[in-house]
Amino acid sequence: MTAIETGAGSSHADRMDRMYRTQRHVYDLTRKYYLFGRDTLINELNVPAGGSVLEVGCGTGRNLALISQRFPDARLFGLDISAEMLASAEAKLGKPRLTRTVLRVADATDFQASEFGETGFDRIVISYALSMIPDWEKAVGAAIAALNPGGSLHIADFGQQERLPRLFRRGLQAWLRRFHVTPRKTMAAVLKSNADRFGDTLEFRPIGRGYAWLFTYRRAAR
């Protein structure tokens, strides 16, 4: 059955709960207009039969529901620091055909696969979450550490809008700051540094003239 477990508490968690206490009810409806690349990321997961998928910062469960439809044999897991958002995820994922989902209130910067009863995950998804996590580099490290050998980390997030007009870029980033969102300039460099360190590989693809960035980080088979 779908289950929610608790295990996180911080000022960041409190801030996210306050922000999403009411927003969570309209989150999916509004975000589809500017969180681009999420469906592309899901379609490219190529989850092995019976494989495990963790979404870090799973929010309302929108992506996990689509992953279940696209890969019906996958075992699904989700974590989020906001208990408010996970309440929406539980409602969305608590349907009979989505009962293989385990949800946990947890900090993206400090989690382990063993907390979910797993030794590692075949796929990890982080969709538009790193731009909201203060210690986002630590979250990247935790996700990489939680991958199975041969597994992959899939990231979609705001880019630097590097090929879009400067006025648009400045306006968008000012608007995003109102919601505690900061596009990470060094995300590609941080991921590449980790890949070089561990002998892994990284694929980087900007979309929408740099509006968003997609990454696929592949762990080497050990």
Q: What is the predicted role of each segment?
A:
Residues 2-46, 62-66, 168-174:
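Conserved class I S-adenosyl-L-methionine
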Residues 30, 154-213:
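C-terminal alpha-helical "lid/dimerization" subdomain adjacent to the S-adenosyl-L-methionine
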Residues 54, 60-111:
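Class I SAM-dependent methyltransferase SAM/SAH-binding core
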Residues 109, 113-124:
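A short acidic, Gly/Pro-enriched loop at the edge of an enzyme's catalytic core
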Residues 137-149:
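A short glycine-rich, Lys/Arg-flanked "PGG" loop and its adjoining helix->strand segment in the class I
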Residues 215-222:
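C-terminal lobe and adjacent flexible extensions of AdoMet/dcAdoMet transferase-like proteins
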